[in-house]
Regions:
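Short basic helix-loop element that most often maps to the first helix and adjoining turn
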Residues: 3, 30-49
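Short C-terminal boundary/hinge segments that cap the last helix of small helical domains
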Residues: 82-98
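DNA major-groove recognition helix of helix-turn-helix/homeodomain DNA-binding modules
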Residues: 71-87
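N-terminal flexible/basic segments that precede or flank functional cores
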Residues: 1-27, 95-152
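Recognition helix of helix-turn-helix/homeodomain-like DNA-binding domains
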Residues: 50-69
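Short, contiguous strand/loop micro-motifs
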Residues: 19-20, 30, 60-64
Length: 152
């Protein structure tokens, strides 16, 4: 478990450097065409730099716009205009730790509420405060154990 936690911490630090990019809006015509036209570069020049035809360069711009361009093709286009493709993922929760905590709390809530429902049927209902405390405790246990059910 300790090795896992260390890996998560290290990866989280790397991913955190991408957090500011979440706000970045992809140009509606795609990055390649936006950069190419901003630089005053023609499709012929882009294609020539990439070692492909004008039509192939144009097709790549279209594929990027519709989301079907490969990373390899985008890297090639980037190299041809002296740029580097940067690729990564950003947790929607802000960090890996927050993602894990949210998933663990969902599972903990299901477990505790199922148990609480059974106890209610037996006239042994817990208070809201006790239920919240049980959810917090179970969440901490799940985070420590990191079971595979987090990702079901």
């Amino acid at each position: 478990m300790k090795k896992n936690k260390l890996q998560i911490e290290q990866l989280s630090k790397k991913l955190n450097s991408y957090n500011s990019l979440q706000e970045l809006v992809v140009p509606s015509i795609g990055w390649i065409k936006t950069i190419r036209t901003s630089l005053g570069m023609s499709l012929e020049q882009l294609g020539g730099n990439m070692g492909v035809t004008r039509q192939s360069a144009q097709n790549l711009e279209k594929r990027e716009k519709d989301g079907s361009a490969t990373l390899k093709a985008l890297e090639g286009a980037g190299r041809s205009i002296d740029m580097k493709l940067v690729y990564g993922f950003v947790p929607v929760d802000g960090s890996l730790e927050q993602l894990i905590e949210r998933k663990a709390k969902q599972i903990a809530t299901q477990i505790v509420m199922r148990t609480s429902g059974t106890m209610k049927l037996e006239d042994q209902e817990n208070s809201e405060e006790r239920i919240e405390k049980a959810i917090e405790e179970r969440t901490a246990e799940i985070i420590d154990e990191m079971p595979k059910i987090l990702w079901d």
